[in-house]
Amino acid sequence: MIGLIFGDTDFPMEILKTIKKKKINYLIIDLSKSKKFKKDKKSYSVSIGQFGKIINILKKSNCKKVLFAGKVDKPNLSKLKLDIKGIYYIPRIIKASKLGDAAILKEIIKILAQNKIKTENSLIFNPELYLKKGNFSKIKPNKQDQLDITKAIKTLNSLREYNFSQGVVVRNQKVVSIEGKGGTKKMLEKSRSKKFRNHGVLVKFPKKKQDLRVDLPTIGLKTLKQSKTAGLKGIV
């Protein structure tokens, strides 16, 4: 039995397809905005602040392992629906929120671990979604591209440990934009250039100490199209 804690984006659907194909027993904790999994009989729609309900659902189903997938927006703590355990744990979440979005996820993992629930890597059932090191296009990066890539990696590594930014656009060794709360789409919109076409790179890169079980940098088809529209040469 695996507990699937799902948010938005298409990533959770890919995991669910594999889970069903392999006939693995599962349940879904649906944290998506639109409650996109409500038609699944094994799905439970809850608020992120209902820790008691979430933990009870998992324990009642003898579910000792979970994985996180999809985007879950940082909650408005003043409007959060809390149950008794939520009230108990909320001071820890508030404290973590001051460090950034990634810190909230890490704190939730700790809370689950204290309740003897282990968090698995989100790609445990879908290793094919993980790209290995290498060049997957016909275009090879030149010297300028390599300089841009190096600049981008240094920029991401210089950010705070709990900063949610996982992406940066660099063109001609200048940082054009860094991923903010608007996500990759907003960052790429800011990076559009009429002067430079086929110049610059988007680098999506995990920072040091980043917990890849719940905070995995992802790139989808939309990002590829948006990068082309922005006039970038490649993605790393």
PLM regions and their residue ranges:
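Short glycine-/acidic-enriched loop or helix-start segments at secondary-structure transitions
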Residues: 14-15, 38, 77-79, 212
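Conserved mixed alpha/beta catalytic, RNA-binding, or beta-rich assembly cores of soluble enzyme
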Residues: 9-11, 19, 45, 98-102, ...
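N-terminal basic/disordered segments at the start of proteins
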Residues: 1-31
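N-terminal glycine-rich phosphate/adenylate-binding segment common to multiple enzyme folds
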Residues: 54-124
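Feature captures the catalytic cores and cofactor-binding loops of soluble hydro-lyases/lyases
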Residues: 31-56, 60-63, 83-89, 93, ...
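Short, well-ordered alpha-helical microsegments
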Residues: 12-13, 51, 75, 105, ...
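Short beta-strand segments
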Residues: 5, 30, 68-70, 170-171, ...
